[in-house]
Curated annotation (Swiss-Prot):
The lineage of its organism: Bacteria, Bacillati, Bacillota, Bacilli, Bacillales. It holds the Pfam family ATP-synt. Keywords: ATP synthesis, Cell membrane, CF(1), Hydrogen ion transport, Ion transport, Membrane, Transport. This is ATP synthase gamma chain. The gene is atpG. Belongs to the ATPase gamma chain family. It comes from Staphylococcus epidermidis (strain ATCC 35984 / DSM 28319 / BCRC 17069 / CCUG 31568 / BM 3577 / RP62A). Produces ATP from ADP in the presence of a proton gradient across the membrane. The gamma chain is believed to be important in regulating ATPase activity and the flow of protons through the CF(0) complex. It comes from the Bacteria.
Amino acid sequence: MASLKEIDSRIKSTSKMKQITKAMNMVSSSKLRRAEKNTKSFRPYMEKMQDAITAVAGSNSTSNHPMLKSRDIKRSGYLVITSDKGLAGAYSTNVLKSLVNDINSKHNDSSEYSLIVLGQQGVDFFKHRGYEIESSLVEVPDQPSFKSIQSIAKHAIDLFSEENIDELTIYYSHYVSVLENKPATKQVLPLSQEDSGQGHGQMSSYEFEPDKESILSVILPQYVESLIYGTILDAKASEHASRMTAMRNASDNATELIDDLSLEYNRARQAAITQQITEIVGGSSALE
């Protein structure tokens, strides 16, 4: 049995750890509220952007823009979104596991796909396992701005436009609620009929200048960048929710451990007192 001093030391260290996890839970809760607000605020912009795409591309089924045309898949592109930091439960692990399973089932070697990785967790995961990373972005802000992720979004689009990849799929954790986050995939290139042919509002008649193809060449890359950014906002909300849940569970486990240690401490203290009384009584009997 551990000594009273050892048990007391464990109680104190666990209590300090509980204070840390409780504080991290509160911080993650605050970040989650902001992330939810960011995602909600971005949604109307995406709907209006999709209306504009519908007005141009939806009425122009003969468009030859490469982002709207499917082609034979010779090389796939995967954009995977993970966290920079740990302590978020299985947030990054579930996404990475989903991607690796798909890579193993669809591809025979690394020449058939390219990896674009967001987050230090993903970078470390693939480097330690010998995967080749096309490009990466780490230290993504907790509340990312469009500018902070635009470079990697543009790089992914350029890979498709230059036919270095023939499709682009995002792997991320989709935020459903505080208690539910699930790995998800989203194909962003080539754009699907749903992306380019369905608006959210009442359509009006438009006149296009200089012409539809020129407009598409400008607006489609911006739209895909926005799709990627919106997905990152969703993933960030999921990350904060996962970390908040993990820290709450850690705090609850710490409370349970402190209770168990306190009970063990009291039993050990009672046993020590009983031993001391027994020794005193034994000593008195010997003197008689």
